Regions:
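Binuclear metal-dependent phosphoesterase catalytic core
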Residues: 230-248, 256-328
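Glycine/small-residue-rich loop that forms an oxyanion/phosphate-binding "nest" at active or ligand-binding sites
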Residues: 64-95
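Active-site environment of divalent metal-dependent phosphoester hydrolases
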Residues: 10-17, 35-40, 59-66, 94-99, ...
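N-terminal active-site segment of His-dependent metallophosphoesterases
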Residues: 1-54, 60-69
Length: 328
């Protein structure tokens, strides 16, 4: 069997770059960020995917233009794409995190996941260590990666400007507050706990894990390898993967750079196949016709051609090249 995998198509930001699928019946996994709002996500999924599973990214439910909390937006997707339907929305918060691929022994375990904020790049760790030496000399408490990463996330991600959750201080349950990194960490802990349980309970199955956030620093592009923001995109879960050989593949998104790699001696597959933002020309090698061959647990592809998309890309590139000299 072949399972198609792609993510981060961002149809709202990429509205000038039309993308639709012809082979809508191919079994497909989409690890998040179809759109910047859940109604747009639902509409595109219904029109293009007739067989598969998907999860929310940080964008799909984060933007509060509907006045809904993140949870209400996930509930909206869960109602329209139930467990017993041909296309299923998965998330720990809606009580649906696992489903068997029809006619196979493959169990998909899926949820947004979020991040534990523990990962820190070697360069950033050196900077933190140097700063802590001086802090201790001044009699101050040292800083730790998790708290630094959370502070960096608040400054660097729009999630914490636009996403909302219920305000716990309001006894009537009417008020909302902005989501914060502590919420993401809490959701990560709940999701990872359930994920670990499902993996342990299904040793007899081949498991594909689907998350929006990445499970290994190998997914970080070389241009961002020293970024202070990396903990907002990845958690280092390689030991969890290698300790559980029934995890055959992990599909993810979020980082807007294509990664197809393996971890461990058993070659457990990591697949990150995001489209990213067309205006930034992030993933020029993006191919939505990317598949996991479940007989070999290797990647297979076939050529992707779209005259409408190619024409839009050419128009944008020509316009960019015409105006670029004025900004140099």
């Amino acid at each position: 069997m072949r399972i198609r995998v792609f993510s981060d198509i961002h149809i709202d930001v990429n509205s000038g770059f039309p993308f639709t699928l012809r082979d809508k019946d191919t079994f497909t996994l989409i690890p998040g960020d179809v759109s910047g709002n859940v109604k747009g996500t639902a509409k595109w999924i219904q029109a293009n995917i007739h067989n598969g599973m998907f999860i929310a990214g940080n964008h799909d439910p984060a933007y509060n233009e509907l006045g809904w909390t993140i949870q209400k937006q996930k509930d909206y997707l869960a109602e329209r794409f139930p467990l017993d339907g041909p296309v299923t929305f998965m998330d720990e918060s809606v009580g649906v995190m696992s489903k068997t691929v029809p006619g196979t022994n493959i169990l998909v375990v899926g949820s947004t996941l979020y991040t534990d904020y523990r990962y820190i790049s070697p360069f950033y760790q050196e900077c933190l260590d140097d700063g802590n030496v001086r802090r201790v000399e001044r009699g101050e408490e040292p800083l730790y990666p998790e708290e630094c990463n959370k502070a960096t996330a608040v400054r660097g991600l729009n999630d914490f400007r636009w996403g909302h959750v219920p305000d716990e201080s309001d006894e009537r349950g009417l008020k909302q507050r902005r989501v914060c990194p502590d919420d993401y960490k809490k959701w990560f802990d709940a999701t990872f706990s359930k994920m670990s349980q499902l993996v342990q309970e299904n040793k007899d199955k081949d498991i594909i894990i689907m998350s929006h956030h990445c499970p290994t620093p190998k997914c970080i592009s070389e241009r961002y390898v020293n970024s202070a923001m990396n903990a907002s995109y990845v958690s280092d879960l390689e030991k969890f993967i290698t300790d559980n050989p029934n995890i055959k593949a992990w599909v993810c998104g979020h980082v807007h750079s294509t990664t197809i790699t393996t971890v461990g001696d058993k070659g457990q597959l990591i697949v990150c196949n995001p489209r990213g933002y067309e205006r930034d020309m992030e993933c020029g090698d993006w191919n939505p016709n990317t598949y996991i061959d479940t007989d070999t647990w290797q990647i297979a592809t076939k050529p992707f051609k779209s005259k409408r998309l190619d024409a839009a890309r050419k128009k944008f590139k020509d316009s960019f090249m015409r105006w670029a000299p004025f900004f140099m």
